[in-house]
Structure formats: C-alpha cells, structure tokens
Amino acid sequence: MNKAKLIDHTLLKTDSTKEQIDTIINEAKAYQFKSVCVNPTHVQYASEQLKGTDVLVCTVIGFPLGATTTAVKSYETKDAINNGAQEIDMVINIGALKDGRFDKVQNDIEAVVQAANGKTVKVIIETVLLTEKEKIKACQLSEAAGAHFVKTSTGFAGGGATVEDVKLMKDTVGDRLEVKASGGVRNLEDFNNMIEAGATRIGASAGVQIIQGLESNTDY
C-alpha cells in the first residue's frame, strides 16, 4: 500500500500564509501525496506550483459551515475548477438535514456535482453534529446526488473522524462510493485504523508525520 497516495495533504487554517502553502506544496512533491487540500483563495497558486506533477489540487466549498446557498456553492465550485482545482470537498447543508428537508440537501449536492463537471466530489457530512440515523441519511443522499466520496469532518466543529463513523459510512455506501476520513488523524496508528475501517482517503495536515511514523499535535 502506497500510504502517500491515500493522503490529501491539508492546510485549511484561517490564517494560512503563502509560506505555509509553499511548505505543503513542497512536502506534497517530495512525498508524492495524492493532493494538497487548500482554501479556494490558494487554488490558483497551488495549481501553478504543482503543474507537471502527479499531485492534485483539492479545495473546499461551502466551508466550514455548509450554510451558504446552493447557488453560491455552485459558483464557488466552478470558480475553483477554473482556477485549477481537480477535486472538490463540499460541506452539506447540515441544518436542512436535521430539519428533514432531504430534497434540499440532495439538490445542494447535485448542484455541486454538476458544477464540478466530472471532477471528484467529496461530501463532508460533519459526523460530530449528526445522529447515527442522520449520518446514514447523509451518505444515502450523497450517493443519490452523484457524489464520489463521503467525508467525515471539516475539522472545525469540535470533532473529527472516528473508526466507528468510518465503519458506519462504509457500511452505508459499500463499494459504490469511497470514504474519506479527516480531522484528528495525527499519526500512523490513526491512519492505519481509518484505512482498516474502510477509508480510502485520509485528509490530514500531518501527512509527513504519518509517513514518517511520528506524532503530530494538529487538529486536522
């Protein structure tokens, strides 16, 4: 197993600087991570710096609350792709899910999938805020909307990926969708536990530490 190719090397902090973006880009090149995952404002620069490499550029949409309108998420997705994004991690409308407005949740995801125009879409369901029933429903709606992955967490809601949630999500989507575990994956043991539970992608700022078998104190 090539661990690096399962990692989205991530920097989504509010105060991310160009120097920090350069660091994760250089690390991604050196370790050959699957992607760098950065906020939309950094997509064009990251795309330019990674041109000619195998490292993809991933970005986040409706992040971290999922509470922007569907039209805004759609535009944000198109803009990100125009700037060079190759993978899209979107946040669902969490409030609508909790209200039982499932059509609204599905339509929101569908709009992003359509705007992504064939690019990989990962749907962040924010597991820490959901009941088990809501987690299952969020996965089902993501599948119905045409997404490619379901993803556990933004890392901004006070909790991250757990083995139990990854197993539940994997059991729900089977082999039809993939599962991305993110938030709190800090070391090789965490990484291995998530992969064993069914994740096929890991979102982490601790990518280097994971590969080196070291511990990180980062939250994402």
Swiss-Prot record:
Native organism: Staphylococcus epidermidis (strain ATCC 35984 / DSM 28319 / BCRC 17069 / CCUG 31568 / BM 3577 / RP62A)
Protein name per Swiss-Prot or TrEMBL: Deoxyribose-phosphate aldolase
EC number: 4.1.2.4
HAMAP family xrefs: DeoC_type1
UniProt entry keywords in alphabetical sequence: Cytoplasm, Lyase, Schiff base
Molecular function per GO: deoxyribose-phosphate aldolase activity
CDD domains for the chain: DeoC
Top-rank lineage group of the source organism: Bacteria
GO cellular component terms, A-Z: cytoplasm
UniProt-listed PANTHER family: DEOXYRIBOSE-PHOSPHATE ALDOLASE (PTHR10889:SF1)
Function comment: Catalyzes a reversible aldol reaction between acetaldehyde and D-glyceraldehyde 3-phosphate to generate 2-deoxy-D-ribose 5-phosphate.
Annotated pathway: Carbohydrate degradation; 2-deoxy-D-ribose 1-phosphate degradation; D-glyceraldehyde 3-phosphate and acetaldehyde from 2-deoxy-alpha-D-ribose 1-phosphate: step 2/2
GO BP: 2-deoxyribose 1-phosphate catabolic process; carbohydrate catabolic process; deoxyribonucleotide catabolic process
Main location: cytoplasm
EC primary class: lyase
